[in-house]
């Protein structure tokens, strides 16, 4: 283990060495004390409305992709959803960035199953001034 573990670099100081030990064949139970009472942080949730959901931006990654608090599993028909953010409307949630043109504002599923707002080959956050906690209105159409 590393001699100094800093509270802000767990990826470097804890997770990377742990992965290396596991890859080298060290058993998980030999790597340290079992934590029986982990602190679990609640994820923010989208609020149900008469026409869909009121969501918020909960994460903006280094590429400017903006994950919302709405899970894709909450959307009854991906093609019939309209998302409104930063004065823009996005029609439908598509399977991948490749379903739209370069520069288009798009809604896709992020790696955690949440609706993500992105710009194909660009930064939605930068292009539209999107910030954490910005509101996202999601409307379902029949």
Task: Label every PLM stretch briefly.
Residues 29-30, 35, 110-115, 137:
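Flexible, D/E/H-enriched segments
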Residues 134-140:
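Surface-exposed interaction regions enriched in Ser/Thr/Asp/Glu
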């Amino acid at each position: 283990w590393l001699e100094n573990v800093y509270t802000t670099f767990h990826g470097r100081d804890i997770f990377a060495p742990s992965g290396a030990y596991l890859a080298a064949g060290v058993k998980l139970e030999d790597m340290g004390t079992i934590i029986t009472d982990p602190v679990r942080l609640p994820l923010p949730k989208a609020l149900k409305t008469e026409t869909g959901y009121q969501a918020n931006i909960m994460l903006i990654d280094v590429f400017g992709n903006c994950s919302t608090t709405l899970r894709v599993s909450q959307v009854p028909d991906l093609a019939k959803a309209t998302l409104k953010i930063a004065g823009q409307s996005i029609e439908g949630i598509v399977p991948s960035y490749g379903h739209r043109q370069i520069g288009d504002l798009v809604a896709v599923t992020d790696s955690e199953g949440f609706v993500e707002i992105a710009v194909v080959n660009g930064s939605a956050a930068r292009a539209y001034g999107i910030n954490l906690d910005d509101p996202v209105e999601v409307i379902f159409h029949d």
